[in-house]
Structure formats: C-alpha cells, structure tokens
C-alpha cells in the first residue's frame, strides 16, 4: 500500500528542487550601448582546456550559463566551440566572448587573429570580442580598435569591447574613432571594487565585467561582513559576492569546473542586498589587493 504522506512529501521535495534548478536557468540580462544584451553572469573558461574543458563548459551550458568567456591566450577557443556543438542549447542563445592578444595589435595581424579565433571555435561570429590588454608602452591598441570596428561591420563580431582598460585608454579610442566599447572587463572583487573605472563605465553606458570576481585565494570569504550576509540570506560567501557585483552593475565571470559550484554560482537572483550592505562590501577595498596596473602591466 502506498504511503500517501511519503508520496506527497517526495513530490513536494522534487518540485522544490526542480523549481530551484529552473530559477537558476532563468538568466537576467543587461542592455549594451550598441543595442545588444549580455547575461548578468558569465562562465569563465581560463585553464579549462582539452576534453576536461569541453566537459566543464558543456556542463555549464546545461546548468544554465549563457555567457562563455574565452581568449586566444587561454588556448581553449576550440574547446569552447566543441562544447557548444555538443550542447543542446541553440547557438543564438549563447553569448560567446574571446580576446585579442597583445602580440596582434597591428591591423593586419589583428584581423587575421579574429578570423583565426572564429576558425578555432568553428563559429560564424563572436557576440563580443575584446582587446585583452591595452599595452600602452607598445601603443598599438588604437590600431587594434580600428580593426575591431571593421570586423563588427563585416559581421564577424556583434559587440566590440576592451579588457583591463583605464578611462584614459578608452577616451583615446573614442576621441580617434567616435566608438565607445560596449564592455570593459577588469579585475574586480571585494578587495578591489575599481571605483574609478566603474564610475567611468557607468557614465558612458559601458558594461563592466569582472575577472577574478571571487578574489583568488578566497580570503574575502572570511570577512565578517560577508559571513554575516551569507547567514542572513542563507547563501554562501561566493553567492553574496556575486550578487553584490551584479547589483553594482557588474557582470561577474566566475570559473567553476564542479557541477555543484556551477549551479551555486548561478543561484543568486532570488535575493537582493540593501544599499547599505552593498556599500559595506565596497568598503572592503584595499589598494594592495590589486594585482595588475594596466598602465604598467603588459601581456602579449
């Protein structure tokens, strides 16, 4: 004989679990200044290479991520493309990013690299392509930007953006071309909220993305303010940080190879921090926590 109470309880638990999974998959979006839109949270693919990378990226798509962030220097554009091909998610519903390395800032080299990126991933277009670092001492980033604008006109790229750019670098691009980036991906976490760049980006309708959004090493997870908020909202410290970033109009790009962490990082849109709580995390800023100064650091 069926135990009706047990049956009802099991159905209730399963429905609650299903509801939670579906909630994670209901992605929210920011509007870009070029008319396109971008998911409010992305999936970082740094160091996700080969078959392991394909598996992790494919799992991320299954779990509800719709923004995949890669780069030429990550050497995994092929893995990203393979994961997309293996996935049941329609290509048009996935926002795919890659980045131009510093060694290819000159016009012809940059154009060839964009085409090579598309070939490596077996894609017809990128939703977003970024200049990875400005490399101001080399001073070819304007040339690279002009290529990006042309590639957008050719249909190879939907949105053009930059990464690790300071306001003065962006001002130079705009002054010379009249085109503002749609996105600026920068180092950002509770110990470095990058106030100057964030405010500039907001004023110019540029969406800020965060690499290393959880601060490598996890030291921020031990902060009293973050622990108390995690307890209050019944969330993990990582979820508090990621939600904080979306509330300051930042798209975090966390990386997670495990199924559990992938799901957990997405489960952040069912609560909201108060303005005072948002400010309490901004107040954790410390100058020494910044890893790279784009005016000095260069990558090729």
Please identify what each model-predicted range represents:
Residues 48-51, 70-79, 103-108, 136-139, ...:
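Acidic-and-aromatic substrate-binding clefts and catalytic sites of carbohydrate-active enzymes
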Residues 33, 81-91, 115-122, 174-177, ...:
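Acidic (Asp/Glu)-rich catalytic clusters
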Residues 65, 123-126, 157, 181:
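A structural motif
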Residues 49-60, 106-120, 170:
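Short, acidic/polar
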Residues 104-121, 128-144:
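Glycine/small-residue-rich loop that forms an oxyanion/phosphate-binding "nest" at active or ligand-binding sites
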Residues 16-94, 147:
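N-terminal binding-site loop/beta-alpha segment at the start of enzyme catalytic domains
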Residues 134-300:
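Beta/alpha (TIM)-barrel catalytic core signal, keyed to glycine-rich beta->alpha loops juxtaposed to Asp/Glu
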Residues 91-104, 128-134, 188:
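A short, structured active-site edge motif that brings together acidic residues
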